[in-house]
Amino acid sequence: MKEIELNSDSLEIYEKSASEKLNKKDLVDLWNLDLKNLLDISYSLKKLFNKEKIDLCSIMNAKSGVCSENCIFCSQSKHNSSKIDTYELKSKEEILKNAKSVEKYSNRFSIVVSGKSVTDLEFENIIESIEEIQNKTKLKVCVSLGLLNKDKLKALKEKNVRIHNNLETSENYFKNICTSHDYIDKIKVILEAKKMGLEMCSGGIFGMGESVADRVDLLLDLKKLDVDSVALNLLNPICGTRIYDKINSGEFIEINHTDALKSICIARIALPKKVIRLCGGREHVLKDMQKYSLYVLDGLMIGNYLTTNGQNIQSDLKMIDEMGFKQ
């Protein structure tokens, strides 16, 4: 692995980050640094807290489309007009088959469903799928099931699964991307899950027209909530979504690879001790620059995403190996 010698200014930021003494202004001001400095600071923090490993996870879109919520970025929302496959909850046999297909590569497998929440019958079937995966694979199981009540959270705690619930963006900016539910609804679920002792993965999407300050506010909320894993996504605008139209009209500017990498670095510096995982949109935004994100990250989502294709898994494994990291 490469050796880094930080200059005095970068060393000061590194030390403040390591001792978690950076405030919002400090983090926003990081945007003024060049990318190389941010990568050097981030890599130094990664080596300090999370070593040289890249943890791999995969997801399955187990129920697709016709979502009641009006998130402007989501191709599964019935308020958008994206042409995607729609289907009800997959059978436990199909879910298990999908899990087994990635077991060789992934450490975690997440069952993801569209919609604000799940019905009681869907939840019962998902619990059965969790048991199947736990009994027949070595995978750790995660679920992304929307806004869950206490009884469902308790049942998931008994199965020792990790809950995923993205905040998506800052509280201040949330109304610009969704009005059918509130930011606080997500916060309440995360707080209740943490109270019950469930592991929590949460994060957001960079590139939806938000400011750098909004990105920092999101990161500071994740820090305050003490989530276990931070899932970062880069907007891949899908035809038929309202955000796609906003980008095409020039209302929003699509995030570029430099801004994306700088944002990921700021996440590392804001949350030095957390698992930072890069998920959807990395292929679309970063392209050949993906390899540099490994200096910042602790994890990658591999395989396909919800309604878009991911990079070939073998290409990801080769990239990790060539950059000198371990799985």
From Swiss-Prot:
Domain of life of the source: Archaea
Keywords: 2Fe-2S, 4Fe-4S, Biotin biosynthesis, Iron, Iron-sulfur, Metal-binding, S-adenosyl-L-methionine, Transferase
Reactions catalysed, as given in the entry: (4R,5S)-dethiobiotin + (sulfur carrier)-SH + 2 reduced [2Fe-2S]-[ferredoxin] + 2 S-adenosyl-L-methionine = (sulfur carrier)-H + biotin + 2 5'-deoxyadenosine + 2 L-methionine + 2 oxidized [2Fe-2S]-[ferredoxin]
Biological process terms in GO annotation: biotin biosynthetic process
Domain Radical SAM core positions: 49-282
Cell inner membrane found in the keyword field: no
GO molecular function, one term: 4 iron, 4 sulfur cluster binding
Cofactor: [4Fe-4S] cluster; [2Fe-2S] cluster
Pfam family, one: Radical_SAM
Binding-site list for [4Fe-4S] cluster: 67, 71, 74
Pathway: Cofactor biosynthesis; biotin biosynthesis; biotin from 7,8-diaminononanoate: step 2/2
Free-text remark on how the cofactor is bound: Binds 1 [4Fe-4S] cluster. The cluster is coordinated with 3 cysteines and an exchangeable S-adenosyl-L-methionine.
This enzyme's EC code(s): 2.8.1.6
Residues reported in the UniProt entry to bind [2Fe-2S] cluster: 110, 142, 201, 277
Top EC category: transferase
Subunit (UniProt): Homodimer.
PANTHER family associated with the record: BIOTIN SYNTHASE, BIOTIN SYNTHASE, MITOCHONDRIAL
Family note: Belongs to the radical SAM superfamily. Biotin synthase family.
UniProt function note: Catalyzes the conversion of dethiobiotin (DTB) to biotin by the insertion of a sulfur atom into dethiobiotin via a radical-based mechanism.
UniProt name for this protein: Biotin synthase
Organism per entry: Methanococcus maripaludis (strain C7 / ATCC BAA-1331)
